[in-house]
């Protein structure tokens, strides 16, 4: 028994409808990876002399406003892929540890929360303020292992400080764009970057660099090295 043209047409139509209902296909490994190394010629800053609670904090602390190693590799630089949005809010863990914020720089998406835990057996009085002066919170953390969670609703840079230990500084880079932070070796990596020309922007608390454009290809990695300066 032969198959009519009508039967073939209906079968094809059924397949087309099923594909449409399933939505657009996504290729495994779609998007590329951007890697790089960030350096600076600026010297490391002088250590901080501790004036309160030296038994917990130590006699001195490294000044990580410029966290650079002996070969110029620069840590704590936020690298952002401009226009590449990240949907789900995410929280940022942050510790008070030996009278320093650990990590010093963290990324956070608008609507997420910073979850602060004190590891120190001394009083920390935490402040968080936006660049426009808006105060997000002012909380006391008098005992170790106390965790407090506070939401951050708007994009921008939030500065963290402690009025008890005035040298303490930390930063929350709040953004809904794909971002990463350079490590002690100056290296960063952004995964699942859409194919095409992407502009990278760089934020550091002290140093600067101009934006850089890179061409990303699906399933491939592209490397970019950047030098920051004052």
Residue ranges and their predicted role:
Residues 2, 21-28:
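Short, low-complexity disordered leader/linker segments with a strong preference
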Residues 11-22:
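Bacterial N-terminal signal peptides
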Residues 2-13:
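Bacterial N-terminal signal peptides that target proteins for export
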Residues 25-230:
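Extracytoplasmic copper-binding redox domains, predominantly the cupredoxin/blue-copper superfamily
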């Amino acid at each position: 028994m032969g198959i009519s043209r009508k039967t073939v047409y209906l079968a094809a139509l059924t397949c087309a409808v099923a594909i449409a209902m399933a939505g657009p296909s996504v290729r495994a490994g779609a998007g590329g990876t951007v890697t790089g190394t960030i350096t600076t010629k600026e010297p490391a800053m002088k250590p901080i002399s501790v004036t309160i609670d030296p038994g917990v904090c130590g006699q001195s602390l490294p000044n990580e406003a410029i966290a650079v190693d002996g070969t110029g590799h620069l840590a704590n630089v936020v690298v952002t892929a401009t226009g590449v949005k990240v949907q789900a809010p995410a929280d940022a863990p942050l510790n008070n540890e030996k009278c320093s914020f650990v990590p010093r720089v963290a990324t956070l998406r608008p609507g997420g929360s910073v979850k602060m835990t004190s590891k120190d057996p001394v009083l920390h009085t935490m402040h968080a303020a936006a660049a426009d002066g808006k105060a997000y919170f002012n909380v006391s953390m008098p005992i170790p292992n106390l965790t407090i969670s506070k939401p951050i609703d708007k994009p921008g840079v939030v500065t963290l400080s402690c009025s008890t230990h005035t040298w303490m500084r930390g930063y929350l880079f709040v953004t809904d764009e794909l971002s990463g932070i350079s490590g002690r070796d100056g290296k960063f990596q952004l995964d699942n970057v859409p194919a095409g020309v992407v502009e990278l922007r760089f934020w550091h608390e002290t140093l600067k660099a101009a934006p850089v454009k890179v061409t990303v290809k699906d399933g491939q990695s592209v490397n970019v090295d950047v030098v920051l300066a004052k």
